[in-house]
């Protein structure tokens, strides 16, 4: 064995490559071993350093891959064990144990997290060269007994199913120990680069290689100053020193110092020396030179997005200077926090990148499909799960529009559960859903699912066969191919499909002869899919590499950007959270020779120093270290390592907000510039100098010219809620000339509430989602229908009997039966409605002096050639003197207010009066009024009554009165009925004023509507709060920002309010 160390200013790779070349020139086969996370980059670096740029004598690889070179022909043809297969094996083992067999873990048998921890423990045991029987000294002895039962049973299953329990390194070590590879190894030289420690498995293999190979060469970075130190605790080279010292002591060899021809920039060397002096308690009498600072940058940004954008701009600048993507490395302090943001931002700046991390399959449509399938079976055809399965794009041959239509209907009809999905759809609504088409679609969905879900408990092999048959019926494979829209997506889908088929194969192999329920089968496949990962190799090498900062090696790239280096992530504190605590691992390590667990927490300090040292030397030209103030929406402090750099004299640059400038980094990329222009266009204006204004004026002029060529336009600002008028063509279609505009009292109210709401409802005809469940509209229809029946019954039957008959016959109507007999909630609503009818009906019984002339009367009120007002009058009454009045049933409290009417928000009663005046017989000239009847079950506070007497009854009937507009002429006739006439009497002239002003409101609205320009102007009564419909989700109206756009209502003092509003009405309607 040969141990080599060198300073950080030299290239260890060049030194080791020279050693490898010498061995190769002598005819030896050389294996150049690198850590798993670095083998790809190391291979490229080694080949670059070779004069011939390639050779068959030197193989750059990993320990695991090296073992396959020697054992590929002699290894038994057994099944391969991966994490998903291991999890299934442990699940099967736990299935065979009863809870009482496992005192410590019996309650966790079906827990997926517990199974994952078992998989991790089993892998750790293999790496540590330990068996489950070596787990002595645990906190609770019962834990070891449970683990022995579980793992031994799992290993028995592995043997039965012909799985290879040995790792590739174990098979390699066994072959060496048996002498099967002596001839090959005698002609082999092993060069090891990039390691600072070995696992127990690697350590054991290394001892065998040292005894059988021609030579083993190991290199590591250690300064000569550190190597000569006797006390190394806390030294930045502590990890490497321990590594070399342990190997030197074990193999009785002295490490040698070597140098390379390549020497890196002195700035990095001087920074390293300062860093070393800080941690070995020595002193230096010099500082960083001014030109050294050109190679280092410390950035501070407010949050992650700004930080990534600054990096992207800097990368674009490097490209402008002539460098390539492959010269740049981006390191992440927190991989999870940055992974989702860095991709879209780099795409915006058109920066190709390769993320050096396996992607989880959890977000792939295939996993979502399997999860929805499993949940559909478990939760009995829940609607959300069925729809998610369809929306994955992998079920059947359905267009998006068909799925949307199916979703709309199932939500309307409340289709959920197997019973409702299995029956034909028969309920329809005013929208007239295409039931024939929906039922055909229902059958295409239900039949294959029903065939699969009816599977009883049976052998796993049979369940897999049925699942595969189901997947063929729904054309899963064909749909999977159709998902990809780019070559990259094709490659991703191929990797996901491969993992999916591997999981099915493993399940068939492990559970093929075990009896399982379908729910267990789908749950196991779903768990395997969600935990699986895949990796896609970049199509080109000229990309920016992105990976976690703790995987970096010295001198990796010319330019390195390390971001997210907050106190919480730099240094990293690693802690185990498995089935064994660190204390238990340490006790096991004390009694085992050459076999040990890796305890990451015990090596946090020296490993973090080693990582920081590698990071500070990762670049060969320029290193940028960045820290955000806020990461994951949490404030964080500077890393202690960055504070040390500040003490060395490196300035901390506050990058600030990404304001646009005319620097190359801001305008050098069209796509990024366009996206930032749009972002600025959505923000409040910022102050600019005259030079800035001139520059951006020219840029915007150019951009608009380019956008017009592509038929694009910049969106308007969020806070300028202006609307565009409809085009002439649309106006002609919506409001054709010569045809009166159709309006109603409700439409007029909506218009004066918020013009844009009218546009949505009556021009675009947008409607809220319908539901079969009764709402206020259906409740109102029910009450109207009961009272219509009641008032039509002129028989001599007692009033109570007639009321019962009206309720009974209304309940028997098919529509109300569907609505109110669907479930217990609907039945409860019906019971409340019946109580309201019984409470309100006596009001009708008391008014014996009235006669009901008509009910549910349709009318069309002609207001000239411009407007046709339509509606339905609930009831027309006639008093004993022949005068007519209008009754409108309301399920909520309503009362006519002249101020609300003046502002256009309550035209209903006056509109009904105008319609009644038009349709009344010629011999009847007098109208006694228009009124609301609140259909309710009055609620009284009994605490306010001293005793239960006639006062209580009077209060009930007082709540059940007619409220509205009444003619002063008919005052005497109204006094005997249940009419609330106080402050509600109007003379004939005043009634005429109301009618004329009502016509003026319609004409004014119609004129504005026909112009086709609808404002976003919800009304406000006080100028401080907005009461009108704001439609925030559509208009983004914010009361505190857009109050100026709200329509201010006219309000007058209560004193003489009626007279003042009537005066205003006469003035505005030109009377």
UniProtKB/Swiss-Prot annotation:
Its EC number is 3.1.-.-. The keyword Flavoprotein does not apply. One of its GO terms (biological process) is double-strand break repair via homologous recombination. Its cofactor is Mg(2+). GO terms for molecular function: 5'-3' exonuclease activity; ATP binding; double-stranded DNA binding; helicase activity; hydrolase activity, acting on acid anhydrides. Keywords: ATP-binding, DNA damage, DNA repair, DNA-binding, Exonuclease, Helicase, Hydrolase, Nuclease, Nucleotide-binding. Despite having helicase-like domains, this subunit does not have helicase activity. Heterodimer of AddA and RexB. Belongs to the helicase family. AddB/RexB type 2 subfamily. The heterodimer acts as both an ATP-dependent DNA helicase and an ATP-dependent, dual-direction single-stranded exonuclease. Recognizes the chi site generating a DNA molecule suitable for the initiation of homologous recombination. This subunit has 5' -> 3' nuclease activity but not helicase activity. PANTHER family: RECBCD ENZYME SUBUNIT RECC. This is ATP-dependent helicase/deoxyribonuclease subunit B. It comes from Streptococcus pyogenes serotype M5 (strain Manfredo).
């Amino acid at each position: 064995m040969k141990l080599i160390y060198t300073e950080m200013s030299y290239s260890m790779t060049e030194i080791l490559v020279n050693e490898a070349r010498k061995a190769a020139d002598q005819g030896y086969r050389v294996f150049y071993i690198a850590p798993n996370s670095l083998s790809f980059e190391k291979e490229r670096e080694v080949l670059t350093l070779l004069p011939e740029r390639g050779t068959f004598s030197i193989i750059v690889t990993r320990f695991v891959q090296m073992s396959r070179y020697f054992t590929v022909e002699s290894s038994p043809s057994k099944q391969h064990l991966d994490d998903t297969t291991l999890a299934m094996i442990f699940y099967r083992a736990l299935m065979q144990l009863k809870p009482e067999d496992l005192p410590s873990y019996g309650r966790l048998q079906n827990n997926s997290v517990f199974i994952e921890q078992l998989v991790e423990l089993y892998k750790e045991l293999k790496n540590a060269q330990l068996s489950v029987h070596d787990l002595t000294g645990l906190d609770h002895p019962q834990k070891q007994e449970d683990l022995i039962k579980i793992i031994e049973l799992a290993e028995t299953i592995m043997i039965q199913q012909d799985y290879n329990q040995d790792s590739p390194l174990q098979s390699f070590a066994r072959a060496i120990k048996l002498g099967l590879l002596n001839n090959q190894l005698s002609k082999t030289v092993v060069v090891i680069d990039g390691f600072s420690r070995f696992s127990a498995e690697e350590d054991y293999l290394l001892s065998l290689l040292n005894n059988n190979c021609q030579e083993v060469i190991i290199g590591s970075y250690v300064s000569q100053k550190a190597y000569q130190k006797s006390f190394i605790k806390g030294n930045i080279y502590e990890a490497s020193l321990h590594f070399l010292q342990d190997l030197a002591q074990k193999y009785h060899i002295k490490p040698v110092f070597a140098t390379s021809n390549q020497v890196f920039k002195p700035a990095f060397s001087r920074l390293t020396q300062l860093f070393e002096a800080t941690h070995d308690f020595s002193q230096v009498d010099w500082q960083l030179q001014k030109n050294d600072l050109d190679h280092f940058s410390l950035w501070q940004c407010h949050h992650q997005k700004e930080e990534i954008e600054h990096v992207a701009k800097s990368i674009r600048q490097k490209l402008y200077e002539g460098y390539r993507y492959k010269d740049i490395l981006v390191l992440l302090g927190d991989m999870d926090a940055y992974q989702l943001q860095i991709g879209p931002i780099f795409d915006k700046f058109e920066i190709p990148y390769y993320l050096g991390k396996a992607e989880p399959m959890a977000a792939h449509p295939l996993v979502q499909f399997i999860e929805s399938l499993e949940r559909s079976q478990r939760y009995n055809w829940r609607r959300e799960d069925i729809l998610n399965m369809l929306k994955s794009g992998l079920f059947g041959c359905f267009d998006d529009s068909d799925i949307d239509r199916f979703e709309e209907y199932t939500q309307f009809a409340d289709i959920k559960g197997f019973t409702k999905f299995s029956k034909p759809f028969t309920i329809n609504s005013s929208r007239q859903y295409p039931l024939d088409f929906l039922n055909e679609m229902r059958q295409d969905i239900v039949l294959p699912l029903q065939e699969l879900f009816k599977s009883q408990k049976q052998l796993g092999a049979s369940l897999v066969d049925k699942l595969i048959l189901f997947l063929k019926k729904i054309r899963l494979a064909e749909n999977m191919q159709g998902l990809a829209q780019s070559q990259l997506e094709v490659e991703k889908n191929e990797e996901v499909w491969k993992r999916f088929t591997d999981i099915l194969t493993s399940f068939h192999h492990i559970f093929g002869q075990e009896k399982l329920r379908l729910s267990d089968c789908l749950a196991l496949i779903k768990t395997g899919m969600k935990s699986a990962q895949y990796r896609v190799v970049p199509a080109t090498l000229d990309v920016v590499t992105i990976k976690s900062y703790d995987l970096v090696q010295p001198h990796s790239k010319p330019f390195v950007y390390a971001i997210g280096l907050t106190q919480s992530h730099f240094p990293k504190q690693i802690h185990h959270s498995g089935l064994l605590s660190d204390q238990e691992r340490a006790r096991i390590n004390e009694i085992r020779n050459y076999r040990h667990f890796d305890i990451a927490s015990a090596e946090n300090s020296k490993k973090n120093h080693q990582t920081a040292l590698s990071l500070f030397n990762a670049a060969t030209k320029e290193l940028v270290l960045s820290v955000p103030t806020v990461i994951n929406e949490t404030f964080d402090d500077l890393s202690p390592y960055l504070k040390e750099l500040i003490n060395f004299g490196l300035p901390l640059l506050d990058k600030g907000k990404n304001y646009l400038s005319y620097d190359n980094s801001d305008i050098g990329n069209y796509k990024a510039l366009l996206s930032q222009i749009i972002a600025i266009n959505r923000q409040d204006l910022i102050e600019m100098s005259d030079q800035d204004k001139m520059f951006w004026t020219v840029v915007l002029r150019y951009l608009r010219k380019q956008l017009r060529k592509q038929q694009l336009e910049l969106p308007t600002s969020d806070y300028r809620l202006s609307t565009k008028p409809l085009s002439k063509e649309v106006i002609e279609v919506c409001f054709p000339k010569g045809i009166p505009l159709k309006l109603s009292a409700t439409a007029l109210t909506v218009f004066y509430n918020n013009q844009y709401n009218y546009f949505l409802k009556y021009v675009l005809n947008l409607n809220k989602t319908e539901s079969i469940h009764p709402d206020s509209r259906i409740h109102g229809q029910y009450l109207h229908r009961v009272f219509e029946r009641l008032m039509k019954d002129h028989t001599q039957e007692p009033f109570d009997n007639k009321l019962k008959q009206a309720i009974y016959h209304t309940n028997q109507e098919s529509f109300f039966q569907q609505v109110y007999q669907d479930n217990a909630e609907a039945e409860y609503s019906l019971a409340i409605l019946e109580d309201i009818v019984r409470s309100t009906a006596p009001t009708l019984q008391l008014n014996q002096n009235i006669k009901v002339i008509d009910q549910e009367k349709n009318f069309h009120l002609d207001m000239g050639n411009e407007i046709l007002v339509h509606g339905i009058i609930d009831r027309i009454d006639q008093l004993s003197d022949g005068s007519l009045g209008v009754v409108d049933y309301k399920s909520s409290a309503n009362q006519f207010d002249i101020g609300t009417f003046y502002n256009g928000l309550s035209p209903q009663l006056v509109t009904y009066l105008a319609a009644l005046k038009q349709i009344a017989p010629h011999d009847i000239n007098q109208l006694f009024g228009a009124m609301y009847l609140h259909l309710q079950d009055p609620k009284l506070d009994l605490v306010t009554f001293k005793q239960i007497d006639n006062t209580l009854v009077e209060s009930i009937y007082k709540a059940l009165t007619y409220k509205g507009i009444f003619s002063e002429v008919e005052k005497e006739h109204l006094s005997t009925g249940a009419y609330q006439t106080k402050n509600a009497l109007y003379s004939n002239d005043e009634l005429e004023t109301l009618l004329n002003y009502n016509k003026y409101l319609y004409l004014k609205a119609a004129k504005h509507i026909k112009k086709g320009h609808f404002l976003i102007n919800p009304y406000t009564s006080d100028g401080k709060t907005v009461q009108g419909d704001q439609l925030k989700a559509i208009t983004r109206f914010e009361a505190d920002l857009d109050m100026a756009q709200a329509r201010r209502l006219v309000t007058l003092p209560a004193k003489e309010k009626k007279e003042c509003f009537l005066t205003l009405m006469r003035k505005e309607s030109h009377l």
